[in-house]
Amino acid sequence: ANWCEPGLVIPLNPLPSCRTYMVRRACGVSIGPVVPLPVLKERCCSELEKLVPYCRCGALRTALDSMMTGYEMRPTCSWGGLLTFAPTIVCYRECNLRTLHGRPFCYALGAEGTTT
């Protein structure tokens, strides 16, 4: 069994601030009340930091998956943009958080299996 499955180590609806942050950064639009970008980034990094490093990439993937169902995308936004930006959230210039790869890095979120 994969212990990074949503509902175990990863919450069922993970990283709410990161979802908003991804949309703001990748699409330039806001969902819900407009929170200043640095505040949103801080909240997102804090949510990610609470997760074990092994499951951080998987949590980002789960957050994106949950957005794909029942989520209205604006014409200015593309899943491609979100998929490209999402894995960079753990990187040095963003949250700088270690992952299962032992450094601040996630593979492209569509590229790995469910263990990431």
Curated annotation (Swiss-Prot):
Domain of life: Eukaryota
The keyword Lyase is assigned to this record: no
Location in or out of the cell: Secreted
GO cellular component, one term: extracellular region
Keyword Cell membrane: no
GO MF terms, alphabetically ordered: alpha-amylase inhibitor activity; serine-type endopeptidase inhibitor activity
Pfam families assigned to the protein according to its UniProt record, in alphabetical order: Tryp_alpha_amyl (PF00234)
Annotated keywords: Alpha-amylase inhibitor, Disulfide bond, Secreted
Sequence intervals crossing the membrane: none
Disulfide bond annotation, renumbered to this chain: 4-55, 18-44, 27-77, 45-95, 57-106
Protein role: Alpha-amylase inhibitor.
Stated family: Belongs to the protease inhibitor I6 (cereal trypsin/alpha-amylase inhibitor) family.
The protein, known as: Alpha-amylase inhibitor 5
